[in-house]
């Protein structure tokens, strides 16, 4: 196995497809679906697993022989967007460009002008600001990033969130908490995070594979 990021999911899925008869992509089914679409993997070659508290639900009824098996997880922030959000923004801001993170639903990505990882969204905002001054860019991702991009390119273009999308877990990381942790590390008083030794080799291997495949 190997890990991937939203930025290199396409490269890693292509690699994984060459390693065997099928791939289990987890944990985000939307990133898996959108990556598969970009690579030309047809919908009939994919299957979103039905998982219950005891594992697979009625496995005999599931298409487990598909080329791509998708774990039914998602990012709660990105999954809340729907195609109507895009249509409403286009109606409110004629001529706007709409981009979104690939952890959004596939039907949302289908009606956007572009989709990509966080780094893609940042680069696209900079490109629009430089090449299309005065234009409007709608960005479908966690709102704090959108607000930072709007502030960074203020006076060049208008950058607006696709909808309300605040991650409560990210919001738990505050400047005060970060300072407290860094101060504890400097004072050698930080609470160590222990990982079971037997988990380290396979985890390291999956990360190393990603770096090697992506040429990093």
Language model: regions and residue ranges:
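The feature marks the mature, well-folded catalytic cores of soluble enzymes
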Residues: 1-216
